Amino acid sequence: VFTHTRTIFVKERQKKTLREEFEEYVLKTVSPEQLIDDYLVPYTNAYVQLKNCEFTATHHADEVNGLLFWLNKTNNSDWMPPAIKFLAEHPNDSEYVLWFIRKLERLASYLLVTAQDVNHRVDRYKWLLVEMESRPDSTLADPLRNIELTDWEKEQFQQTLDGEIYTMTAQRRNYIIQRLDSFM
């Protein structure tokens, strides 16, 4: 949770030790009480729900948890900071949570299937975190925009899926096959 909290604050790939960057970018900007009450407690609660596919709500919990299953099957956790921040900030809006997690799963799938490197992934999620910070009151009626795939990304995703899936690395190939199988 500390690593993801650091990422939410810094929005960049880690360059120094976690301790150094946490002190520099997090502890210098919030009080200890704020850190615990406003960040660590809600972020930890969100992390547990995301990692264990245990989102609870009166509506859409099963759908959200199904999407979380696939997010957790990706070969990285770069998607986790925006998911933690979003869930911590919108815990009682299950409609918007479903919309967000569905879009996030599509973005994470795109990044995995098209074999984007860690720098591209971190940069892509950075812009989502920047928008989340600048628009904390976003709603389903006026949702976050940076979570959407661009036209170029959609085209690249489609071309990759239309390509030679069986020559891909096992991680990418198996993810695609299992994900397609889940729709049947």
Name every feature range the model reports, one short phrase each.
Residues 1-183:
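A cross-family structural signal marking well-folded subdomains
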